[in-house]
């Protein structure tokens, strides 16, 4: 199995376009208090996030970011760093911009006020457009997924973030403002399974707050947002499709914005997180198909 995974990864590198092949194995990007790392082995999805020098989103082998799907009848996911099936995400184009100028990164970290990555790729039968931008200490991400034929799926995930196991508490807030507040238990269960726009994490030791806001979804009757409480991470992901058909000619859009704050008083962290969510909840109108 290990040989099969290694062969699939090496083959995927030969299939990369010249622009992507010019990128080093890892790219470090810094803007304000945020540092992210992109890795070739994860198809240049984000693979690590730090804030003020603190690790907040992990880069362990099974901690995947980005987009992944599982076709009906398959035990394996495809996309991002998943290579279990031997069928990996294939990067078609990759562009990186620092303060508006396109750059080809080297071994040194790149820094700027505004950093943007644009990527197109294929995942199984899907065409994926992905972009992220780091500006004003906020990470904004947008994913567009389309298919030329009907696809029967078990799951289609996007906006995945494996937040670090350091986080002790969570606060999930729905569209009406109702809160679900609790402590993580690392019991492999999900703290949330419905679509809600506001997810918040808190680390009592450091006082770090992470807030992510997902734009309303208008795709799929089974769309939802998950918060998986594991020992290795506290993972957030948007499920665009679950046990349903992804119709040909349609485009699914996932938009997520992430910000950070600090509050050492644990009695005040939820109110601070709510305030941060209001700042993050600024999305342009969704594109008409």
Over which residues does each language-model region extend?
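Bacterial N-terminal signal peptides
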Residues: 8-17
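Beta-strand-rich recognition/accessory modules
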Residues: 21-34, 39-43, 199-289
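Short beta-strand segments that buttress and anchor functional surface loops
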Residues: 116-123
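Hydrophobic/aromatic beta-strand elements that line small-molecule binding cavities or substrate pockets
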Residues: 128-132
């Amino acid at each position: 199995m290990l040989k099969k995974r290694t062969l699939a990864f090496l083959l995927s590198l030969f299939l990369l376009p010249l622009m992507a092949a010019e990128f080093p194995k890892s790219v470090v990007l810094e803007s304000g208090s945020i540092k992210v790392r992109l890795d070739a082995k994860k198809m240049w999805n984000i693979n690590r996030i730090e804030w003020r020098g603190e690790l907040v989103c992990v880069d362990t082998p099974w901690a995947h970011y980005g987009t992944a799907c599982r076709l009906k009848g398959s035990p394996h996911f495809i996309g991002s760093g998943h290579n279990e099936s031997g069928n990996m995400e294939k990067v078609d184009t990759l562009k990186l911009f620092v303060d508006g100028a396109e750059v080809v990164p080297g071994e040194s970290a790149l820094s700027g006020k505004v950093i943007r990555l644009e990527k197109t790729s294929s995942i199984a039968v899907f065409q994926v457009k992905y972009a992220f931008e780091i500006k004003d200490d906020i990470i904004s991400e947008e994913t567009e997924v389309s298919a030329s034929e009907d696809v029967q799926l078990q799951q289609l995930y996007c906006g995945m973030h494996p937040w670090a196991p350091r986080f002790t508490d969570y606060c999930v807030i729905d569209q009406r403002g109702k809160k679900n507040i609790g402590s993580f238990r690392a019991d492999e269960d999900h703290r949330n399974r419905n679509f809600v726009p506001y997810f918040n994490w808190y680390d009592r030791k450091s006082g770090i707050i992470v807030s992510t806001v997902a734009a309303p979804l208008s795709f799929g009757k089974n769309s939802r947002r998950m918060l998986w409480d594991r020992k290795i991470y506290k993972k957030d992901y948007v499920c665009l499709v679950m046990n349903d058909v992804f119709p040909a000619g349609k485009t699914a859009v996932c938009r997520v914005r992430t910000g950070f704050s600090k509050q050492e008083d644990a009695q005040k962290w939820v109110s601070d997180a709510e305030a941060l969510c209001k700042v993050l909840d600024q999305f342009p109108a969704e594109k008409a198909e």
